[in-house]
Amino acid sequence: ISTTALTHGNSQKKDKDNKKSISEKTKEEVKNIQDYYIRDSEIAWLQDKWIYDILQPLIREANDKAGWHYDLETAEQIQFTVYKPGGLYGWHSDGQQDIANAYRRYFEGISIEKKINGELPPKFVKQNHLIGQVRKISMTCNLSLPNEYTGGNLKFDFGPHHMGERYHEVKEIRPQGSVVVFPSWLPHCVTPIETGVRYSLVLWSLGRPLR
């Protein structure tokens, strides 16, 4: 899929359960995935222009048609993700949209509690173009065929005050090549893979913090 990629595993387990792999657990044991694992997947980072050229227009279209009208300035590297049997991603949001979060990911020693007042801390990192930016829109693109895996659905939590259903599993994107675009603050998870392997692309569009 890509001419250049940096690959590594991404498995984060809570201390209380670090002796048992997710594949060894029963469905009952993983029914509350946040109690056991934050994430269990393999990822690679892609920077191919032709992939951006396909995905970014879809994000801009969704930003307009959904009425979000976020000011977008740049994008992160594209994440290629592999979820194998037992793989999952617990409940999370892709980023908060405040000024502290815009800086703390990119500098050593910066925490959400530290006041920044718009000034850059002294230690820079390689991702200079991302400094001061926050994730505003997230996109997931399914690369697998529907019959190649079971489980592994993207699931949203719209909150207790949502007029409709609070939780929704996005089975609409199971057809290969389907995409879903959503605000990065929206809580979501990937349910455990039961059989097969799920491949996906994830892209985040960024802009200045909301005021």
Model-found features: residue ranges?
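Fe(II)/2-oxoglutarate oxygenase catalytic core
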Residues: 1-181, 185-211
